[in-house]
C-alpha cells in the first residue's frame, strides 16, 4: 500500500523566491515541470489567476520559463525582490498564484471597485513601475496596478524593541552551509522559552503544506543553553528546496 504521506496532493504546488531580475522571466522547478507539464507546453501559454481580481492572465511558457506576459503580471501585482510566489496547479496549464512577503505572510492588496475595469484594459506590453505611495500624476499613468496594503508600525521604546516579537509561535531559520553539513539547526532562545520545550532527548515533527512529515531529534545543549534539532534537517531542507540566501519561516 502506498504511503499516504507521500502521495501526490489533489492540487500540487511549487514556489519560487524572487531574486534580482525576476521580472524578465520565472523558472518552473525541474521536478515539477517534468512531472506535471513537460510534453504539454510547446508553443502554449499558461493561465495565471489571483485573488486580487477575476482577470485571467495569459503568459507564454518556453521550456521551463514563464516569459511573454510574466513581466506585466508581476508588475501589476507589485511583486518585489524577496517575495515568495506560490503556484497552485489547478489542472492543465492553469495556476492560482499567491504572493508572500519576506516575512512569509500573504500579501494583501487594497480593494478598489475600479481595479477590474482598469486592469482589463492594460496592453500586454505595458510596464507598471510605481509604488503605492506614488504621486497622483504617476497613478494616472499606472492605472491597473494592484497596490499593496500599507502596514503602519507602532513606535515602541528601544528597550522593548529588542525583545519584541509579533508572533512567538514561529521563527525564521537561516539555512547555511554549516547547518546543512552538520545536519543540525539551533532554535532561537526566544522561541524555545515561549513554546515551553522540555529538556532532554525528544522528537520534533516538521510538516510541509502537502502534509508530508519529517521526524527529527530535538535536544538541549547545556553549554549554550539552546535547543537544536538534528537527524533529518538536511533531508527536510533539500526536499523543500530551502535556499541558502533566503530565510525560511518555521511555525
From Swiss-Prot:
Residues annotated to bind DNA: 11-103, 170-251
SMART domains the UniProt entry points to: B3
Signal peptide span: none
Species this chain originates from: Arabidopsis thaliana (Mouse-ear cress)
SUPFAM superfamilies: DNA-binding pseudobarrel domain
Keywords annotated in UniProt: DNA-binding, Nucleus, Repeat, Transcription, Transcription regulation
Cellular component GO terms held in the UniProt record: nucleus
Full protein name: B3 domain-containing protein REM7
Chain's gene name: REM7
Top-level lineage group: Eukaryota
